[in-house]
């Protein structure tokens, strides 16, 4: 339970810092109908979006215990509607964009509380310093401080509930906001309902984390914890509303979150708010690493260098992403400078994430046998609700919403180009029946006149089938330079829907000569082919299926194992080989995006000292015509 509070609820738990302030910022008046309506919008947004959609429905759509929009897509990627991947790309792109704005707004709002103590305190430099420290410590892992997050967030939520309850006593009538009538009345009668609804939506921006962190905490822990968290949040929102109605003349000029704090707790609350903002930022950063790791294994994103700073399962650190996020957060801070301006940039991207999740959930429920009518009711209802939220947040586009939408758009386009280019490359891999080459491979092994290339020669076969082989792979063994070896190993990598799967099967195709190994890897598992192959070989040796002792007498007498060499076939696209401008543009962008990627041997976890990369042309379309022979004219008289 405590761990769940620290991991899952950091983002949604810091929303009281800025939601009511944002509502006061966009509202034209401060009176009872507006405040009760706004509070009712908050309460029922939390109920419909977080409780019903995510806690009651989405948490049941688990992929072997894992959650999140990419885990959900992994369950659906074999769906007959092949365009479903676009929903996952859009949802992932907007979720990653939200991960850049969240640390900026939460930490800034927390530090702005110091202005009530010292109005001339430089908020921006302090915020930049805290953000810098948060991103710097990622490289060392957060195992030690992460253990204290749960207890800290428990204290934070108790503080929210306690001060909210104390403030609620001053205007108990505010509890009427629990009735959805006041939200509906605001939407029907208030000219600024659109802006108020866009601000109220910020209360649920952390709801996606409940689903994304399903694998870390479990459905039961999240469900039980949410009952406590939601109660504390509602008490705090009601307390802020009560204070606003009692101080309507000055409410718009202060942050009601800090205004309801007893004077003796003000400094303590600022410290707690800053700590909660750091916890929320940490959760978003770690979540970004996890999302991109999944995207890499789903072939949505280029392979990047991943580090494991601690022994905790699932704790990742991606240096390039950490630096990119840090630069993005700093630019957001320098561009908007204070939380009031950041509120306009916040919420738009995550609305799109939720809308994409709704559509994917609809396909999932239908796939699981839920009736078509119920699926249509669920998807239709939430498309209407989230469509209204999206329209409300689009009203903030020019004021700052363009920023996160631009980030999300760039990320979506990068992923789309990567996916489309990868598919085209796979489509142009020519495969041949492997059985046609059994005899010639055996003959090469037996031909002493061919210099031995390696004791064990390993290829990664990209056809995806054990019965077929990439023609360029065969060309490498037979034609390019005949490669004699004692054993030939063909590795087939199969990425499966189950997140933590790691298993293999091995077939002996030619006795004591040719072996095919299929490795089934879950989308949360980092591929480390060298390590996995070593385990496979050890199993085969123990079973007596292969003898790996060196063939050289001077080494064999001491039981020294033969060497391994890996051959990687790398296809290179040359734009001048094609007149197709569409292919040229797509593959040029693919090559540009690929510059942030590590090379294939490192991506597969191979020992680069024993890897040879052979480059071959990737031909997508051929130029028409042929070389014309010129016959020289014979001298006269001949």
Annotate each PLM feature.
Residues 1-638:
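The structured alpha-helical core of multi-pass membrane proteins
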């Amino acid at each position: 339970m405590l761990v769940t509070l620290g991991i899952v609820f950091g983002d949604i738990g810091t929303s009281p810092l800025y939601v009511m302030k944002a509502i006061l910022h966009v509202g034209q008046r401060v009176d009872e109908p507006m405040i009760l309506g706004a509070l009712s919008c908050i309460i029922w947004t939390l109920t419909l979006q977080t409780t019903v959609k995510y806690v009651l429905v989405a948490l049941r759509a688990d992929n072997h215990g894992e959650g999140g929009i990419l885990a959900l897509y992994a369950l659906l990627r074999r769906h007959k509607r092949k365009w479903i991947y676009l929903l996952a790309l859009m949802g992932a792109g907007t979720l990653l964009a939200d991960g850049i704005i969240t640390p900026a707004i939460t930490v800034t709002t927390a530090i702005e509380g110091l202005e009530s103590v010292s109005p001339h305190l430089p908020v921006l430099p302090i915020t930049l310093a805290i953000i810098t420290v948060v991103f710097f410590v990622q490289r060392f892992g957060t195992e030690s401080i992460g253990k204290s997050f749960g207890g800290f967030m428990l204290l934070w939520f108790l503080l929210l509930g306690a001060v909210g309850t104390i403030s609620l006593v001053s205007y108990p009538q505010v509890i009427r906001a629990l009735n959805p009538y006041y939200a509906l009345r605001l939407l029907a009668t208030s000219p600024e309902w659109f802006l108020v609804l866009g601000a109220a939506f910020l209360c649920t921006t952390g709801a996606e984390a409940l689903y994304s962190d399903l694998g870390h905490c479990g459905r039961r822990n999240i469900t039980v914890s949410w009952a406590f968290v939601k109660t504390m949040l509602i008490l705090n929102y009601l307390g802020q509303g009560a204070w606003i109605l009692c101080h309507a003349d000055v409410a718009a000029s202060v942050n009601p979150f800090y205004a309801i704090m007893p004077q003796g707790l003000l400094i303590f609350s600022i410290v707690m708010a800053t700590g909660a903002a750091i916890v929320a930022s940490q959760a978003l950063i770690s979540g970004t690493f996890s999302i991109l790791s999944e995207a890499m294994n789903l072939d949505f994103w280029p392979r990047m260098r991943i580090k494991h700073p601690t022994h905790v399962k699932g704790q990742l650190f991606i240096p390039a992403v950490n630096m990119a996020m840090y630069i993005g957060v700093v630019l957001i801070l320098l561009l908007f400078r204070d939380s009031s301006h950041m509120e306009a940039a916040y919420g738009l991207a995550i609305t799109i994430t939720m809308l994409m999740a709704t559509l994917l959930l609809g396909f999932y429920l239908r796939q699981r046998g839920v009736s078509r009518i119920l699926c249509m009711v669920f998807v239709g209802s939430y498309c209407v609700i989230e469509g209204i939220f999206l329209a409300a947040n689009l009203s903030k586009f020019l004021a700052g919403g363009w920023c996160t939408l631009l980030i999300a758009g760039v990320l979506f386009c990068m992923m789309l180009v990567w996916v489309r280019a990868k598919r085209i490359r796979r489509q142009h891999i020519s495969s041949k029946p492997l059985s046609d080459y059994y005899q010639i491979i055996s003959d090469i092994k037996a031909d002493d006149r061919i210099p031995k290339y390696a004791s064990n020669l390993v290829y990664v076969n990209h056809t995806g089938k054990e019965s077929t082989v990439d023609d360029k792979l065969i060309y490498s063994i037979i034609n390019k330079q005949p490669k004699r070896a004692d054993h030939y190993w063909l590795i087939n990598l199969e990425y499966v829907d189950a997140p933590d799967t790691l298993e293999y099967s091995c077939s002996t195709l030619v006795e004591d000569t040719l072996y095919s190994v299929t490795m089934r890897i879950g989308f949360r598992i980092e591929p480390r082919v060298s390590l996995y192959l070593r385990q496979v070989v050890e199993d085969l040796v123990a079973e007596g299926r292969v003898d790996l002792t060196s063939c050289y007498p001077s080494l064999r007498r001491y039981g020294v194992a033969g060497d391994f060499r890996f051959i990687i076939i790398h296809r290179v696209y040359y734009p001048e080989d094609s007149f197709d401008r569409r292919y040229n543009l797509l593959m040029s962008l693919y090559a540009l995006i690929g510059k942030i990627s590590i090379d294939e041997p490192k991506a597969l976890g191979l020992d680069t000292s024993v890897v040879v990369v052979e480059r071959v042309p990737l031909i997508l379309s051929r130029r028409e015509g042929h070389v014309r022979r010129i016959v020289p004219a014979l001298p006269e008289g001949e």
